[in-house]
């Protein structure tokens, strides 16, 4: 009798504990908490357009839909579109698998997407909305999947399963214990905004990716606030790009192999440029590295085959071979640049001739060094000075401030140049093109120091009036 009573009570408890299932408008739900009035969507025989609402009315109560149970919308091949509600927090394992949908928006409320989800071979556009917590935005935890390649198993982010993805709008930070979130996908355009962080290898070798845009509110996440190493490695990004002030660093090789036509930096408070960050930027023809740069890494701008005019306005740290592998018309170091690695950044060789670079030394027609005092160049622990190459000494014309000409002609390293000339543009001040003109004869020079007529095209020119030179920017 006691055994029978015990069995009966256990069955009663199980029946009482069983979650309440219900269906509204063709969507199956399961109650999570009657007290908190929450529920989750569960699997079912779905087809066509599926809408998961923010709330669902059941028993006269509006229940928040906060979860998709494991295997919801899994292998429901006839589903053509999915709308996810604004209260959804968790997308379980094996959800959103093998659907016919071409677009998907992940709402800002979602904090977790489980393993083996998002197997959407036809998805072309993905939008990940900003976090619903504006004051303290949280990242979305991204699950992984396992695949076997040549008998070897690899664990990868589930986002790599989106094999037809062409467009991504990312306004949220994504967290995953595997790198390469969108690696090697057929993406064509990417928009980055909100607190989305651009992490290492995130878009590695997306060889169809031509368009990249940053929104005005982009903060690049809470940690690092930069572009991760190899984030856009070998992505043929095109057009003129301005990097927002929020970016505090560019990781190693992050934009190596891009097709940008022009690069601009808005940060005025300090940022670093990692090794090879913009190497093989084949379409840029001129570049200004602003004063805010704190470090230019090894090979950072190497092998930019069409880069002809380079202006370095920073006295930040220069690494060896940072500017190698290019064929320059003009390279200018402004008056504040007294770095001891100027030679090493362009030559990449020490005085003994032992190479330390991945690219060939730069070819330079005209080198402008505007520091009033010749910068002393690096001496290694062997006592050897890192100088320029023999070809650079012979073939490059060195322009220096007129008042410092004799000092350069007698200074270590600099005295080895065969052609050293006074630079009429050295030591000038910056003014706008519409600044009030001074009285007296006016002479105009280009940045090569050549006398010209009044400038009529867009660019930077040198105006010489009453023994005073100023830089004029013609917009």
Predicted regions and their residues:
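C-terminal tail/sorting-segment detector
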Residues: 1-3, 462-475
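Sec-dependent N-terminal signal peptides
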Residues: 4-13
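Sec/Tat signal peptide C-region and signal peptidase I cleavage site
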Residues: 15-19
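Structural signature of tandem-repeat unit edges
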Residues: 24-26, 45-66, 77-90, 99-112, ...
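Short, surface-exposed loop/turn motifs with a glycine/proline- and acidic-biased composition
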Residues: 58, 446-467
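Consensus positions within tandem repeat domains that build extended binding/scaffold surfaces
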Residues: 71-72, 92-95, 114-117, 143-144, ...
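A recurrent domain-boundary module in secreted/ectodomain proteins
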Residues: 410-427
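Residue-level detector of functionally pivotal "anchor" positions at catalytic/ligand-binding pockets or at interdomain
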Residues: 423-448
């Amino acid at each position: 009798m006691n055994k029978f009573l015990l069995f009966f009570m256990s069955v009663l408890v199980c029946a009482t504990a069983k979650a309440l299932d219900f269906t509204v408008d063709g969507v199956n739900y399961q109650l999570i908490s009657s007290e908190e009035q929450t529920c989750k969507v569960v699997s079912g025989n779905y087809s066509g357009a599926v809408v998961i609402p923010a709330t669902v009315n059941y028993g006269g109560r509006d229940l928040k839909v906060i979860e998709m149970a494991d295997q919801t919308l899994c292998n429901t091949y006839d589903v053509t579109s999915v709308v996810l509600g604004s209260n959804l927090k968790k997308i379980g394992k094996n959800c959103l698998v093998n659907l016919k949908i071409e677009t998907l928006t992940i709402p800002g409320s979602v904090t977790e997407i489980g393993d083996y989800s998002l197997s959407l071979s036809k998805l072309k556009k993905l939008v990940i909305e900003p976090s619903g917590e504006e004051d303290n935005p949280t990242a979305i935890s991204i699950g992984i999947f396992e695949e076997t390649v040549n008998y070897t198993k690899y664990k990868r982010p589930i986002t790599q399963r989106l094999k037809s993805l062409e467009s991504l709008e990312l306004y949220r930070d994504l967290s995953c214990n595997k790198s390469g979130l969108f690696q090697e996908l057929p993406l064509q355009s990417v928009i980055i905004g909100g607190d989305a962080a651009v992490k290492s290898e995130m878009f590695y070798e997306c060889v169809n990716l031509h368009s990249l845009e940053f929104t005005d509110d982009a903060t690049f996440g809470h940690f690092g606030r930069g572009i991760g190493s190899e984030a856009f490695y070998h992505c043929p990004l095109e057009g003129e790009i301005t990097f927002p002030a929020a970016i505090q660093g560019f990781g190693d090789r992050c934009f190596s192999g891009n097709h940008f036509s022009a690069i601009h930096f808005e940060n005025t408070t300090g940022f670093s440029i990692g090794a090879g960050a913009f190497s093989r930027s084949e379409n840029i023809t001129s570049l200004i590295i602003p004063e805010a740069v704190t470090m230019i890494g090894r090979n950072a701008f190497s092998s930019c085959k069409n880069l002809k005019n380079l202006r370095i306005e920073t006295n930040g740290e220069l690494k060896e071979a940072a500017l190698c592998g290019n064929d320059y018309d003009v390279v200018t170091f402004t008056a504040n640049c007294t770095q001891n690695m100027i030679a090493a950044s362009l030559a990449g060789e020490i005085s003994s001739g032992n190479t330390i670079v991945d690219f060939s030394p730069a070819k330079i027609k005209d080198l402008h060094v505007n520091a009033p005092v010749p910068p002393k160049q690096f001496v290694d622990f062997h006592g050897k000075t890192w100088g320029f190459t023999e070809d650079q000494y012979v073939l490059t014309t060195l322009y220096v401030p007129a008042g410092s000409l004799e000092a350069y002609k007698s200074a270590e390293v600099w005295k080895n140049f065969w052609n050293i000339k006074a630079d009429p543009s050295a030591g000038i001040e910056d003014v706008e093109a519409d600044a009030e003109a001074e009285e007296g004869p006016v002479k105009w020079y280009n940045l090569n120091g050549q006398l010209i007529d009044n400038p009529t095209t867009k660019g930077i020119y040198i105006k010489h009036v009453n023994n005073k030179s100023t830089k004029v920017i013609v917009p």
